[in-house]
Amino acid sequence: MTQTNFRSGPDANGLFGSFGGRYVAETLMPLVLDLNREYEAAKADPEFIKEMAYFQRDYVGRPNPLYFAERLTEFCGGAKIYFKREELNHTGAHKINNCIGQVLLAKRMGKKRLIAETGAGMHGVATATVAARFGLPCVIYMGATDIERQQANVFRMRLLGAEIVPVTSGTGTLKDAMNEALRDWVTNVDDTFYLIGTVAGPHPYPAMVRDFQAIIGKETKEQMLEKEGRLPDSLVACVGGGSNAMGLFHPFLDDASVEIIGVEAGGHGVSTDKHAASLNGGVPGVLHGNRTYLLQDGDGQITDAHSISAGLDYPGIGPEHAFLHEVKRVEYVSITDDEALDAFHQCCLLEGIIPALETAHALAEAMKRATNLRDDHLMVVCLSGRGDKDMQTVMNHMAAAEHTQEQLV
């Protein structure tokens, strides 16, 4: 892989440079290899492609708009800001793009049961949605901490027929849910399809999820050429595991004129131990079947991640992001909880759009940058999801802030 072609990975072993690979139990290796064969065959099958296009159009509601955020642009006083409106998809986020692709693959492989992990609940909702549509039983592993802060999505999953398994090990968040889902998969390899929600896990998952999400960037490229007659100057997206970001970024990686920025969750600050910024505060290691950047202590043990956003509260990042960081094609920065909350409120007041707290991290970075850019600079922000699920978190934070203010007075 040369640095003039950033889109050619992974190699036959699932590696992006030194990142990725297949670090799985011996019992899972035949299944992972079989999944890779089936995926490669499906990609080349016109019927599979046709069926996926049908569901993307008539079920998900694609293409979604590329929207000029006029009032936010005026407020920042610099770059012209566009939103790629993934929150308008069926289920309210980008997650459904990947779930449609994987459930069609599961059906093609004759699998009878779906399992998934979820943090913010949006991947769980999207998985439960496709399971209902295709008549498959579905088990969702979700950390007990995340269940408490995402009650609305838990109820949605149950309405859709999914069984929710609370995970109390560790910190009860996304990392722990993924551990339990992998244990289930090892036990039920013959009839179960593990529908991973981000660009992580053993090969072929990082590449497969990226490919299913790349419709975001493909549409953005077409829509920007139609609206402005040229490519955007910059792209901004939040990064937890990193599937919405990779979906937006990948079609543009070989367009050298396009600056690409991934935004990690800075929590209370990367200099503290309360953040989820794996690239800005981590080191390479192996977790959940792939080698990538991870939050680790001096003994190589995975440390707890923190973010106000459940969907970014993960101590790792997709291996392709790790590669793009090392070769410096993408710039990765971090935004704190407080900065994300400020951007959340500004987006609500200026654009009448309530974004997910994950998305608010990207908005905060976009607003910082836009102010210092020319008014002919075209910036695209991936509006990865809507904020309905985050109402309780925001309410709690506002109540706590008011209480603190009262004490100061």
Swiss-Prot record:
Q: Superkingdom of the source?
A: Bacteria
Pfam family of this protein, just one? PALP
Task: Using the UniProt record, name the top-level EC class of this enzyme in a single word.
Answer: lyase
The reactions it catalyses are: (1S,2R)-1-C-(indol-3-yl)glycerol 3-phosphate + L-serine = D-glyceraldehyde 3-phosphate + L-tryptophan + H2O
Pathway(s) served: Amino-acid biosynthesis; L-tryptophan biosynthesis; L-tryptophan from chorismate: step 5/5
Q: Required cofactors, per record? A: pyridoxal 5'-phosphate
**Recorded GO MF terms:** tryptophan synthase activity
Q: Give the CC-aspect GO terms.
A: cytoplasm
Q: Which residues carry this modification: N6-(pyridoxal phosphate)lysine?
A: K95
Say what the protein does: The beta subunit is responsible for the synthesis of L-tryptophan from indole and L-serine.
**Assembly and interactions?**
Tetramer of two alpha and two beta chains.
Say which family it is in. Belongs to the TrpB family.
PANTHER family recorded for this chain?
TRYPTOPHAN SYNTHASE, TRYPTOPHAN SYNTHASE-RELATED
- Protein name (database record): Tryptophan synthase beta chain
Q: Which gene encodes it?
A: trpB
